[in-house]
Amino acid sequence: MAENFVVVDGGVVAPKGFKSNGHKDRKYGAALIYSETDAVAAGVFTTNKVFAHPVALSKDVLVNNNVFRAIVANSGNANCFTKGGMEDAELLVKKAAELLKIPENQVLSASTGVIGRKMPMDIITLEVERAFENMDLENSNENASKAIMTTDAFPKTVAVEFEVKDKKIRIGGIAKGAGMIAPNMLHATMLGFITTDIEISKEDLTNSLQKATDESFNNAVVDGDMSTNDTVYVLANAQSGVKYTDCKDEFDEALTYVSKELAKMIVSDGEGAKKLIEATVYGAETKEDAKKASMSIVRSLLLKTAFFGADPNWGRIAAAVGYSGAEMDMANFDIIIGDISSEKQAILVKAGEQIADCGTPELKLAEEIMKEDKIKIIVDLKMGSFENTAFGCDLGYEYVKINSEYTT
């Protein structure tokens, strides 16, 4: 399907009526995203039964309010499983509301960092003040993205634009995440903040975000660990003058694209990762089976290490699909490895028959492809018509180093 939008600069400030900025001083940082007019909001959160105080606070605020103006986020501390954590979460929101001169119940919040450590609120609130001071800077979007980074190697930002009846609608986003990525967010350590200037109801925005999340963040795996803080927010302020009811398909497609791009940036930045892996499963009996099989591939530690070493051990792909729980017939399925950036493909298994073996050109080509930094795995189960794409990365020595020293 042809894309009905174009990529533009600006991230969360690309849509009309939004400002942002961030500030980080070594370990701790804070970011603000602000709508100059009233907006509706939607959010999805971690399903981890151990969840952070800002998750609990913002869930409640979203349920009980219909008007929102801002998002405030801090990095360096997760504000999870600590004494006085809810009071600290409320203080973070209060500081943002005071600076922006808006009610506290119009502010959504998020935190990321070390779990089980008391929030240094004197430092965090100072970072919020510093972020607020320069919300009109030309590079304010990148500042906000950098401010929420922890073990991230680079800021993650994207924006798109499409037209309806000669009016432009924009969607922009920033995200952070590199490790502890295996979200399962319903109704995403990984944070995603998205803005749009479309006019949309809270119910429709929530439904659109849930659909986009299922196709993007919930298909992303770095290490298989689900964070206590995973969160994605969308603010929509209606400044484009275009109603969602006039462009449902176009908006949902664009929102899913933004979400997928942010999810792919996150897995590309997996702690120590060098390669993006896209696993697409076709021909599944159900959508659930397609997701089970594709997620099983990108979760497999054996496969992650194989991609790190460019080892074309395709048997690990077959095994991952086989134990995923998806219906399959081992006598009739395909496995292909390809380079995302080109048309190179190596057929490893065809209709259940081994094609690639020691000394064959297919195995040699697979090894060459696995040296690239963007690799796709294609599996056709030949059981039905459903498909799913999951996103993952390789796993190397640097991941162990980063996580063995995280709190020291």
From Swiss-Prot:
Pathway: Amino-acid biosynthesis; L-arginine biosynthesis; L-ornithine and N-acetyl-L-glutamate from L-glutamate and N(2)-acetyl-L-ornithine (cyclic): step 1/1. The record marks A188, T189 as: Cleavage. Its EC number is 2.3.1.35. GO terms for biological process: L-arginine biosynthetic process; ornithine biosynthetic process. It is found in: Cytoplasm. Gene3D superfamilies: arginine biosynthesis bifunctional protein suprefamily (3.30.2330.10), ArgJ beta chain, C-terminal domain (3.10.20.340), L-amino peptidase D-ALA esterase/amidase (3.60.70.12). It catalyses: N(2)-acetyl-L-ornithine + L-glutamate = N-acetyl-L-glutamate + L-ornithine. It is an enzyme of class 2 (transferase). The record marks T112, G113 as: Involved in the stabilization of negative charge on the oxyanion by the formation of the oxyanion hole. Keywords: Acyltransferase, Amino-acid biosynthesis, Arginine biosynthesis, Autocatalytic cleavage, Cytoplasm, Transferase. Pfam families: ArgJ. Substrate binds at T150, K176, T189, E271, N403, T408. GO terms for molecular function: glutamate N-acetyltransferase activity; L-glutamate N-acetyltransferase activity. GO terms for cellular component: cytoplasm. The active site is at T189 (nucleophile). InterPro entries: Arg_biosynth_ArgJ (IPR002813), ArgJ-like_dom_sf (IPR016117), ArgJ_beta_C (IPR042195). Heterotetramer of two alpha and two beta chains. HAMAP family: ArgJ. Catalyzes the transfer of the acetyl group from N(2)-acetylornithine to glutamate, forming N-acetylglutamate and L-ornithine. Belongs to the ArgJ family. This is Glutamate N-acetyltransferase. It comes from Methanococcus maripaludis (strain C5 / ATCC BAA-1333). The lineage of its organism: Archaea, Methanobacteriati, Methanobacteriota, Methanomada group, Methanococci.
